[in-house]
Amino acid sequence: MFKVGFIGTGVIFDLNILGYLNNPDVKITCLCNRTTAKAKEKVKKFNLDKNIPIYSDYREMLDKEDIDIVEILLPHQLHAEATIYAAEQKIKGISVQKPMALTLDQADAMIDACKKSGSILSIYENFLFAPHIKRAKELLEQDYIGDPSSIRIKTAMGGKGGWKIPISAEEWRRQPEKVGGAKRGSPVLFDNGWHDFVLAHWFFNEEVEKVFAWTGNSQGLDAPAYVMFKYKQKFEHVVPQYGNMEFSLLPEMEIPSNYYPTDEFIEIIASRGVMKINQGTSIGNKMSTSDIFAPIVIIRDGKVESYSDFEKDWKFSFINATNYFIDAIKNNKRPILSGEQARYILKFNLAAIESAESGKEIFLE
C-alpha cells in the first residue's frame, strides 16, 4: 500500500482527495498546510484518521514522513521548489497541480531532479479524464468524423454561483509573481487556461507551429482573451490544422455549479463531420440534462447523433485522474502528462502570453 501526503489543503484539495479515499492501494498518512487549522478542517470533512500528522512546513513533512506519493497543491510559484525537494527525498510518485511551473527553466529543473532520483513526475490534469472528454477522444481515434482540421475551445467564466472561493485564494492569483504568465499576471490564460492548451494538444496529437493572442483587462483579469494557433503538421492531413481559444466573462449570469462557475465548450471540425462538446464543469451539466443540448453531438452523413453514455459530474474527472496516477506508480508507467509533455504545454502557453504582450505572432521552435 502506498502512503500518500498532501502539500496544500485549499479548495482544490476537496476534489484531488476523492480518488484516494476508496482506493485499496493507497492510504493518506500526512497533510501539510501553512495554516494547520485548515488541514484539521479537512480531516473532519473527509473522515481521515484524527491522529494524522499535520505540518505547516512541507520540507519538515517530507523529511519526517515515509511516504511514496505526494500531491503538491500549492500556488504556482512554489511548484518547482516543492517538486525538486520531494525528488531529493526520493518520493516515488510526485503529482503537481497545474500549471507545471512559472518558467521553462523551472520545468527543466523539475524534470532533471525527478530523473536523477527516479521519481515519476506527473502534472495533474483532470480534464483529460473527464468522462465526456474521454468519450470524445475515443470517437476521434476511431476516425468517426474523419481527419480533424480545426478546434475551437470557448471558455465562459466568472458568473455568479459555484462554491465559495476563499479571499486568500483569489488574492494570490492576482499577484503576478505568484500566478505567473504576463508581467501583470495571467490568472485566465496561465491558470484556468492551462486546461485548454492541454486539450488543444491532446485532441489533435500535434505540436503547434505558431500562435497569436490578444488579451483584454477586465475586472483585474487578462480577459476577455483570444488565442489563435496553427499546428506543425508532423503527420499528413487532409487539410492544414488550426485552432482557437476564446475566454469570455459572464459577470451577471447565474451559473449553477457545485464547483467553479466556469465551462468549456468545444467544437471540432473534421473531414467527414463536426463534433460539439456541450458537457462541462457547470453550465454544461445543466445543459446536458435538457432536450436541446446533448453532452456530445456529432453531425455526420446528414444526420445528427448524440452521446450521453457516461458520468456527468466533474468530480469523476478527478477520481479517474487520481486512479490513473496511482496505477502509473504501481506499474512504473509514464503518466499521460509527464514532466516532458507538460513542459511542452508550458511552452505553448507562455508563447501565447508572449504574443499577447508583444502584439506579434510567436513561433514555437
Language-model segments: residues:
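N-terminal Rossmann-like dinucleotide-binding module
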Residues: 1-47
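C-terminal helix-rich "cap/oligomerization" subdomain common to oxidoreductases
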Residues: 26, 69-71, 232-238, 286-289, ...
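Active-site loop of classical SDR/Rossmann-like NAD(P)-dependent oxidoreductases
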Residues: 34, 311-322
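Beta-loop-alpha module in the N-terminal Rossmann-like domain of NAD(P)-dependent dehydrogenases
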Residues: 52-113
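Hydrophobic residues in well-ordered beta-strands that form the structural core
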Residues: 95-96, 121-123, 277
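Rossmann-fold dehydrogenase core element
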Residues: 109-127, 147-151
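Predominantly a Rossmann-like dinucleotide-binding segment in NAD(P)-dependent oxidoreductases
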Residues: 128-219, 359
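Contiguous beta-strand/loop segments that form the cofactor/metal-binding neighborhood of enzyme cores
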Residues: 191, 195-285, 317-331
